[in-house]
Amino acid sequence: MSGTRIRYGYRKRPVTRLGAGAVLIGWIMVSTLAWAADRPPGLMVQNGRPAPDLRLTNMEGEVTDLRDLRGRWVMVHFWATWCGPCRKEMPSLQRMVQRMAPERLHLVLVNTAETDDEVFAFLGLVAPDLNSLMDRDGQVTEKWQPRGLPSSFLIDPKGRVRYLALGGRDWASEPYLAFLRHISQAPAAKVPTTRR
Amino acid sequence: MLDNPMMKRCIGMGALGLALLSAVAVAADPASESGVYTGHDLVVHAQARTPDQTTAFYLGRGFPAAMLKEFNQSCFVTVSMRHTRPDVVWLEPARWRLRDANGRIIERRDRHYWNRVWKAINAPHASRATFGWTQLPESRDLQPDEPVGGNITIVPPTGPFSLEFRFATGKNKTGPEIVGRIEGLVCQAQESDMVTGNAP
């Protein structure tokens, strides 16, 4: 009888440990998911207004129309070579693209009012895998009204403006990658619309 | 000289290098340098550009001579700021006051002024756009830790001058007002030789 009790006792402890382990693992998973869903610093929630028109050519003359990119998240990034934070941020955009599935998030660079020579020389040095649309007279940038350069707008699969990044950042750092992966796998309707 | 593309690139890269270097230098230790205000959880930097710096930057971006000549009639002051307050800080340069050593108000040339000038000389849209993005916004509700920077342009004063800034705070501008001052700014008097083609 006492032996049974001992065996029972020995059996009970692993069960307790297993339960505690499961709780711990569950807590870690929940925390990780919650962290992944957190909005990292510097991203302003927008009101879901329709994105302004954007139809421009790149340096090779190829046309990109934002409307053709419906169905996936799009980052529209306005920049210029003379802008210090833009120069610092551009390599991180290239690394971000390398780490994100293209069907989830599409990066659209828009250079504001510079020449092919200026853009070609700069991108070739710091982000040779990226190409940029050319807003040659700056009118498209004006229509989008970024708060400054650089500015990144996150557009949901239905073509609505959901987030605006304030200034430059390391887009390839884990908090931003986790956030981008999280929003780009969630249905657009579930993205929070509360304005800060 | 203005038509020489190699010269334009050299001048542009030089100006860019100067700007980047000065930005790094200013960021190193804001409390120990002139041209810096720190307080109320915000940092403001202000630095008057020399005519050669201003001209080199825009010349390097392919601006036409007519626009460069207009720049020579103004002094460019580069201002940057960032705050770590929990509320909104309102950037509104129209509320700032610039005064010379005798206390006289120095006129600021805002975007309306420049738009009239560009229209009068039929400046290219690309150059107008670039110029506009290099200016400090006329109004901005700066969020916590949101960086902002750009130029304000003034009628060139003789001698040192001060910049007194006022920031409303809070979403509806109902928070405490922040007032600060940066002293000892100086604009160089002479025009840039790069515009007139007299550079050596």
What are these regions (language model features)?
Chain B
Residues 13-23:
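Bacterial N-terminal signal peptides
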